[in-house]
Amino acid sequence: MAASRLPPATLTLKQFMRRQQVLLLYRKILRAIKQIPSDSDRKYLQDWAREEFKRNKSATEEDTIRMMITQGNMQLKELERTLALAKS
């Protein structure tokens, strides 16, 4: 029997799309954090974001992942609003 080239745990289309949403959110959060003027605050928030995503990396339940994405988007919007107010 020939060995399969697919990895043993191939993602379904739904899982793949959800993973892309999570990665996009992570990148957006890190880009927003780069706009923070204070080095110490920027470092703190970068560490916080990394730890939150690492902590939730093993989540597999669809509803839980959707809820975390929604919360992450709300936190991103709040950060963007705060940065906009700080610049004005």
From Swiss-Prot:
GO cellular component terms attached to this protein's record: mitochondrion
Domain of life: Eukaryota
Presequence extent in this chain: 1-19
InterPro entries: Complex1_LYR_dom, Complex1_LYR_LYRM2
Functional description taken from the UniProt entry: Involved in efficient integration of the N-module into mitochondrial respiratory chain complex I.
Protein family per UniProt: Belongs to the complex I LYR family.
Protein name from the UniProt record: LYR motif-containing protein 2
Lineage, broadest ranks: Eukaryota, Metazoa, Chordata, Craniata, Vertebrata
